[in-house]
């Protein structure tokens, strides 16, 4: 009996766990602190800093099942979804990774054992072909001499993309940085399907399908193109779950695996479709996966960047539902079936089900108002065509007036063997695109970040003053041995009481002093495992290995502590008043105020704002102890502390509890008891005015600042009289900025 998709996912993770790999949870679809990516599109994304040497992990082997989206930007499969057997906007990438641990020998043998062993996937060895980079004799010999793959099924692939090292079998992170040859494994579906082996003229056929790519990171590419050997070579592999499921379930299309069969049946049920072979069913089944998980990870339909890609996918699905005869809103009804088929991989989505359904329903209702009129206009324009191309001006008018993304218009044209003048459309969109580029952070130079090999010990939970040693100095981003009076710099210490900005909490300010020098700290940031003190040397000279006294601005730190603890109470109160679907989407905690962004269906009513504020102050009056405990991440989850997407967690996490009201993961500084906060007041509540947007923002103050301040206008005139029973609000602090 064939394994289910869920069983295949688990078997992959179990296999590599048995080989000493740490099983790491999927990261968010919105890349964490990586402005170079629109969406997470590969398993290695969450380990990018590790491969670049900017971050270190407690483990040297890892395995994941990473949720990925390829739509928009450089990696865009959207237009092909529904027309091919293997293109998806959303997929899961199974991967195993070595960070300077094992290399080619083990990576290749692990892959072969998993694929061919009777205990695991038990694929026929004679059905497997492999490719290696043309000059990678080491990998070739391992496949041929150790694994025993016949020479005729090992294919060398050279530079087939027009330049040195430009090859299907040579992977590069960017123009510079880690890179290396790769070895791909293909499955032969048999001669009843057209296609040839990789490297042949018929390689684009469906007979030989790539199922696994094993990347050997062994070089560091320089700006002049030279390749320097990495001191510790690493391994990054990726295998599409849907592809290997198709192979193991003996079907030729990803859309025939058990997961998609169930989803397609659900789509047919909610749309009333009877032809289960319709490509529209495949489109919708694919799109509900990317849309639901993107919304769950905090992306909201909009007209910019990630939000616009999401809107395009939603509207393409709605249009295909229209083609199937759906008369009412249907797309949001697929969230529940999706959760059912995804199983444990949808645990976070299940927690946000109500919000995801509401966002999808609102977006569908909005688009439904213009869909029919837009389609009528498009039909009219296409009927007038004398050639085979719709002009870009009309495509832009459909976008601007009726909300038709250009790929939706192209989809309609494609079904009639017509094209869209996309160059003309882009010309009409030039002003909007320029503004989007100017507001976008994508494409930042990752190599400009300060790199620190050493680590700093943080002592700020218990101390605000600490004797320490300077371990590194940076001026203008470059490492130096000394700095002089008047120079701005970043100072790294071996230990420090200064809190580095993270979790929404700003960095500390203060001074670093010794007998001959004073450094004014205006900010504190994290650089990998090190803590950097940003500021200016006001007197003297400071050198590496100098001793200093690190002095935190205590008054400012205390105000931040109170605001941070109040933020946790606010989150708990929001979940109590509005519902458990509320999830934190961003925060800012400084010495003046706290700002808290969260998900909800609609703007808060005045009486709800009053209830939240009153509930927070009730918890302050209870004067509950604020306690912290360091434990394993899994133990923290069992304790009730929810770890959501968007934050990187170490194996050991800090759990913060406030009586019976709040339990969460947080590395920030806090009050000792809730009563220390004194008073809490909400100043403003706002949200985006984009239709379908459900991210709200509270601006609030706590402590001495709250006394004598004016309350939020437009308040409910009378208390509601609602009585609350304290409940554990499972939450955590995000590092999202403003």
UniProtKB/Swiss-Prot annotation:
Binds 1 zinc ion per subunit. InterPro entries: aa-tRNA-synth_II/BPL/LPL, Ala-tRNA-lgiase_IIc, Ala-tRNA-ligase_IIc_anticod-bd, Ala-tRNA-synth_IIc_core, Ala-tRNA-synth_IIc_N, Ala-tRNA_ligase, Ala_tRNA_ligase_euk/bac, Thr/Ala-tRNA-synth_IIc_edit. Keywords: Aminoacyl-tRNA synthetase, ATP-binding, Cytoplasm, Ligase, Metal-binding, Nucleotide-binding, Protein biosynthesis, RNA-binding, tRNA-binding, Zinc. It holds the Pfam family tRNA-synt_2c. One of its GO terms (molecular function) is aminoacyl-tRNA deacylase activity. One of its GO terms (biological process) is negative regulation of DNA-templated transcription. Its EC number is 6.1.1.7. One of its GO terms (cellular component) is cytosol. Gene3D superfamilies: 2.40.30.130, 3.30.54.20, Bira Bifunctional Protein, Domain 2, Threonyl-trna Synthetase, Chain A, domain 2. Its cofactor is Zn(2+). It is found in: Cytoplasm. It catalyses: tRNA(Ala) + L-alanine + ATP = L-alanyl-tRNA(Ala) + AMP + diphosphate. Its main location: cytoplasm. Consists of two domains; the N-terminal catalytic domain and the editing domain; the C-terminal C-Ala domain is replaced by an unrelated sequence in this strain. The editing domain removes incorrectly charged amino acids. Belongs to the class-II aminoacyl-tRNA synthetase family. Catalyzes the attachment of alanine to tRNA(Ala) in a two-step reaction: alanine is first activated by ATP to form Ala-AMP and then transferred to the acceptor end of tRNA(Ala). Also edits incorrectly charged Ser-tRNA(Ala) and Gly-tRNA(Ala) via its editing domain. This is Alanine--tRNA ligase.
């Amino acid at each position: 009996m064939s394994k289910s998709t869920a069983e295949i996912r688990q078997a992959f993770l179990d296999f590599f766990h048995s080989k000493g790999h740490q099983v790491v949870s999927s990261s968010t679809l919105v890349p964490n602190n990586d402005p170079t990516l629109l969406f997470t599109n590969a398993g290695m994304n969450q380990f990018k800093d590790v491969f670049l040497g900017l971050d270190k992990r407690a483990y040297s082997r890892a395995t994941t099942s990473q949720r990925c989206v390829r739509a928009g930007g450089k990696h865009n499969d959207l237009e092909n979804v529904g027309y091919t057997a293997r293109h998806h906007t959303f997929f899961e990438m199974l991967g195993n990774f070595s960070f300077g641990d094992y290399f080619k020998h083990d990576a290749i043998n692990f892959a072969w054992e998993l694929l061919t062993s009777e205990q695991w996937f038990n694929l026929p060895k004679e059905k497997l072909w492999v490719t290696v980079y043309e000059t990678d004799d080491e990998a070739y010999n391992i496949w041929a001499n150790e694994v025993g793959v016949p020479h005729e099924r090992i294919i060398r692939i050279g530079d087939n993309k027009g330049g040195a090292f430009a090859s299907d079998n040579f992977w590069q992170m960017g123009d510079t940085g880690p890179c290396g040859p790769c070895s791909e494994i293909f499955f032969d579906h048999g001669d009843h399907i057209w296609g040839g082996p990789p490297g042949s003229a018929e390689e684009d056929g469906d007979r030989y399908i790539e199922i696994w790519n094993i990347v050997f990171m062994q070089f560091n590419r320089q700006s002049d193109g030279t390749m320097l050997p990495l001191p510790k070579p690493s391994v990054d592999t990726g295998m599409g779950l849907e592809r290997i499921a198709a192979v193991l379930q003996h079907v030729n299309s990803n859309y025939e695996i058990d997961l998609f069969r169930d989803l397609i049946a659900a789509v047919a049920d909610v749309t009333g479709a009877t032809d289960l072979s319709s490509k529209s069913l495949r489109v919708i089944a694919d799109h509900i996966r990317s849309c639901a998980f993107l919304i769950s990870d905090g992306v909201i339909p909009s007209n910019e960047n990630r939000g616009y890609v999401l809107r395009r996918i939603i509207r393409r699905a709605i249009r295909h539902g229209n083609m199937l005869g759906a008369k009412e809103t249907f797309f949001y009804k697929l969230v529940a079936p999706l959760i059912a088929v995804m199983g444990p991989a949808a645990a976070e989505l299940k927690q946000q089900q109500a919000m995801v359904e509401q966002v999808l329903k609102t977006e569908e209702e909005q688009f439904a108002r213009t869909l029919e009129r837009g389609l009528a206009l498009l039909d009219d324009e296409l009927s007038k065509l004398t050639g085979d191309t719709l002009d870009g001006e009309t495509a832009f008018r459909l976008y601007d007036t009726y909300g038709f993304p250009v790929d939706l218009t192209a989809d309609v044209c494609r079904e009639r063997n017509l094209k869209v003048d996309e160059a003309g459309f882009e010309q009409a969109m030039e002003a909007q695109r320029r503004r989007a580029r100017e507001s976008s952070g994508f494409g930042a130079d990752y190599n400009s970040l300060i790199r620190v090999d050493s680590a700093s010990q943080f002592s700020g939970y218990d101390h605000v003053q600490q004797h320490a040693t300077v371990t590194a100095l940076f001026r203008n981003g470059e490492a130096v041995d000394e700095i002089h009076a008047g120079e701005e710099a970043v100072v790294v210490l071996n230990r420090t009481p200064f809190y580095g900005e993270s979790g929404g909490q700003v960095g500390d300010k203060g001074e670093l002093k010794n007998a001959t020098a004073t450094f004014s700290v205006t900010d504190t940031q994290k650089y990998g495992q090190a803590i950097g003190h940003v500021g200016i040397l006001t007197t003297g000279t400071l050198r590496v290995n100098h001793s200093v006294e690190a002095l935190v601005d205590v008054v400012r730190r205390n105000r931040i502590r109170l605001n941070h603890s109040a933020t946790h109470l606010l989150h708990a109160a929001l979940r109590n008043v509005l519902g458990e679907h509320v999830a934190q989407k961003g925060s800012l905690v400084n010495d003046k105020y706290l700002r808290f962004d969260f998900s909800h269906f609609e703007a808060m009513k005045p009486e709800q704002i009053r209830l939240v504020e009153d509930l927070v102050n009730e918890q302050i009056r209870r004067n509950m102890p604020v306690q912290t405990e360091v434990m394993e991440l899994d133990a923290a989850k069992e304790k009730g502390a929810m770890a959501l997407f968007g934050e990187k967690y170490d194996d050991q996490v800090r759990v913060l509890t406030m009586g019976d009201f709040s339990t969460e993961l947080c590395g920030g500084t806090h009050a000792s008891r809730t009563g220390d906060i004194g008073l809490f007041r909400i100043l403003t509540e706002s949200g985006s005015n984009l239709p379908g947007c459900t991210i709200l923002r509270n601006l609030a103050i706590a402590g001495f600042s709250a006394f004598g301040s004016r309350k939020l206008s437009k308040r409910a005139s009378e208390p509601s009289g609602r009585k609350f029973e304290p409940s554990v609000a499972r939450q955590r602090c995000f590092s999202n900025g403003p």
